[in-house]
């Protein structure tokens, strides 16, 4: 990667905002998600590799999801969430997005 590309990457990364996502899984999500899990996890890895996804996963009770994302704005993040197979297949049934300021 050329030096100018590295600077551009960090400029764009620092320009992105951070967002917290809280959502809810459907009933029996552990079983219903199985046919789509590999596709979902591959997509998340891609988002992580592109520094869009910081972290994402279910709560211990598996009723809720929690995630931290980098995005240019709320609409971009909504599109990312709704393009996920879990949203398309009804595994995730709702979500809320909150702009987040990382203190440290």
Language-model features: locations:
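Short, Lys/Arg-enriched N-terminal segments with co-localized hydrophobic residues
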Residues: 1-15
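Conserved, structured core segments of small domains
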Residues: 16-104
């Amino acid at each position: 990667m050329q030096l100018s590309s590295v600077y551009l990457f960090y400029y764009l990364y620092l320009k992105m905002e951070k967002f917290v996502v809280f959502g809810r899984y459907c009933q029996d999500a552990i079983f219903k998600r199985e046919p789509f899990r590999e596709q979902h996890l591959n997509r998340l890895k891609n988002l992580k590799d592109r520094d869009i996804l910081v972290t994402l996963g279910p709560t211990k009770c598996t009723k809720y999801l929690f995630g931290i994302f980098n995005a240019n704005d709320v609409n971009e993040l909504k599109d990312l969430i709704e393009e996920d197979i879990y949203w398309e297949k009804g595994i995730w049934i709702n979500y809320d997005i909150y702009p987040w300021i990382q203190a440290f």
